């Protein structure tokens, strides 16, 4: 799974997802891409599940780019623990995805295969998405 090699701080503030994405809104590598419509937090596990689904659908042909990276540590307190006594320990990493951000790109497979793969990826993610083409 994706995770940063080094971090400056162990724990992060909860934060908010920014409004419309300013960078990463156009296709950079592939001919087809998956663009977010909502802003939400996407975990490393969800990204990995999407990657596996897409590579399986593409039968390991073509190329898949993941344009997001989970760099925010999300902490959680154990179950049935009373309030207070500090912040919980880091549980997993996530990325804050803004609306309009390109998350996945595909190149080198037929159009129907690419669209099917991106639909499978979309089903694994907690945000509403749209499939975009390079020349649309």
UniProtKB/Swiss-Prot annotation:
One GO term under biological process is:
translation
Q: Does the keyword Transmembrane apply?
A: no
Q: Name one GO molecular function term.
A: tRNA binding
Could you confirm whether the keyword Cytoplasm appears in this record? no
Q: Which GO terms describe its cellular component?
A: cytosolic large ribosomal subunit
- Which Pfam families does this UniProt record tie to the protein? Ribosomal_L16 (PF00252)
Q: Which domain of life is it from?
A: Bacteria
- UniProt keyword annotations, A-Z: Ribonucleoprotein, Ribosomal protein, RNA-binding, rRNA-binding, tRNA-binding
Q: Provide the family line.
A: Belongs to the universal ribosomal protein uL16 family.
Its quaternary organisation is: Part of the 50S ribosomal subunit.
Q: What does the UniProt function comment say about this protein?
A: Binds 23S rRNA and is also seen to make contacts with the A and possibly P site tRNAs.
Protein name, please?
A: Large ribosomal subunit protein uL16
Biological source species = Rickettsia africae (strain ESF-5)
